[in-house]
């Protein structure tokens, strides 16, 4: 079984908990998620099954969309409402000032990841160090906030939708907004509404998954989130060359290579998605596709 499940992770479960449920349901070991959601957050969590685990990096690289609630006037050690309160301050900013501060983060900005995160430094996850009372210096990361829509501002609460790049911590965004306003802030609610091409309206709950007799009925194809990529469709006569990882020349293809040098493409054998390649150029200016990753072994 190979494909992707769009799971609605409930609050109270870790992303790995969801993977464990799917493994048990399918009686398969080759199962993985595509981007950690905080245990207390809910939302879209694509789960890769079988050979689809080999494309998880492409899903990790995709944009994410969230609905979040920011509570101003509080600072905690975890940057969310569940952490130990470090400081409380009065919120004196007007709704217009709050709106301006929130929207000022649209674009690229440098974030310092929270200590309570799964990032590894020298082989140790930061949250493991944080639980031991150890805090270490973290390097800034450039993240991109593509869009923010403010849904409501009510006293110290701000509800907003945000579209952002991979690796963006919404907890840290909330903390940073609070710092700009001079009163501190924490994330008090988080729902991931989209991850790459997977959205909330097509996600299934754990309960719905457990009730299914045939999971393959809802399994999405491996290339479902890759529709934005160009396709290189290889003629069946050249299947051996592809599965051996050899170069793919234009005459191997149903159509010629139109893509520019350096562009990654999805490689198909007729209708079957078999891997990824990148367009390269030989010394005599003949384009070819170099195989980057095969999803299936040669039989």
Curated annotation (Swiss-Prot):
The UniProt record lists the EC number as 5.4.99.25
Q: What are this entry's molecular-function GO terms? A: RNA binding; tRNA pseudouridine(55) synthase activity
Keyword tRNA processing assigned: yes
The UniProt record lists the keyword Isomerase: yes
Which InterPro entries does the annotation name? PsdUridine_synth_cat_dom_sf, PsdUridine_synth_N, tRNA_psdUridine_synth_TruB, TruB_C
What is catalyzed by this enzyme? uridine(55) in tRNA = pseudouridine(55) in tRNA
Alphabetized, the UniProt keywords read:
Isomerase, tRNA processing
Q: Which CDD domains match?
A: PseudoU_synth_EcTruB
An example of a Pfam family matching this protein is: TruB_C_2
Q: From the record, what ranges are coiled-coil?
A: none
Q: According to its UniProt entry, what is the function of this protein?
A: Responsible for synthesis of pseudouridine from uracil-55 in the psi GC loop of transfer RNAs.
Official protein name in the record: tRNA pseudouridine synthase B
Q: Which organism is it from?
A: Alkaliphilus oremlandii (strain OhILAs) (Clostridium oremlandii (strain OhILAs))
Classification from the root reads: Bacteria, Bacillati, Bacillota, Clostridia, Peptostreptococcales
Q: Which gene encodes it?
A: truB
């Amino acid at each position: 079984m190979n494909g992707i499940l769009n799971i609605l992770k409930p609050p109270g479960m870790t992303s790995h908990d969801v993977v464990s449920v799917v493994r048990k349901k399918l009686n398969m070991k080759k199962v993985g998620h595509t981007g950690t959601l905080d245990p207390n957050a809910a939302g879209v969590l694509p789960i890769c099954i079988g050979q689809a685990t080999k494309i998880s990096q492409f899903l990790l690289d995709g944009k994410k969309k969230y609905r979040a609630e920011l509570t101003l006037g509080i600072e905690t050690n975890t940057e969310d409402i569940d952490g130990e309160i470090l400081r409380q301050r009065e919120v004196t900013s007007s709704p217009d000032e709050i709106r301006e501060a929130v929207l000022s983060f649209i674009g690229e900005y440098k974030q310092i990841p929270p200590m309570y995160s799964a990032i590894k430094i020298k082989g140790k996850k930061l949250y493991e160090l944080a639980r031991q009372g150890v805090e270490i210096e973290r390097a800034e990361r450039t993240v991109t906030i593509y869009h923010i829509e403010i849904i409501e501002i009510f006293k110290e609460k701000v509800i907003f939708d945000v579209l952002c790049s991979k690796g963006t911590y919404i907890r840290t965004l909330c903390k940073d907004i609070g710092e700009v306003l001079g009163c501190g802030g924490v994330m008090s609610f988080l729902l991931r509404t989209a991850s790459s091409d997977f959205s909330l309206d097509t996600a299934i709950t754990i309960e719905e998954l457990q009730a299914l007799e045939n999971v393959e009925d809802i399994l999405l194809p491996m290339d479902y989130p890759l529709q934005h990529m160009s396709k290189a469709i290889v003629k069946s006569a050249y299947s051996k060359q592809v599965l051996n990882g050899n170069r793919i020349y234009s005459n191997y293809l149903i159509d010629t290579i139109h893509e520019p040098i350096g562009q990654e493409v999805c490689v198909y054998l007729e209708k079957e998605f078999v891997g990824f390649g990148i367009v390269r150029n030989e010394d005599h200016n003949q384009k070819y596709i170099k195989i980057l990753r095969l999803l299936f072994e040669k039989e």
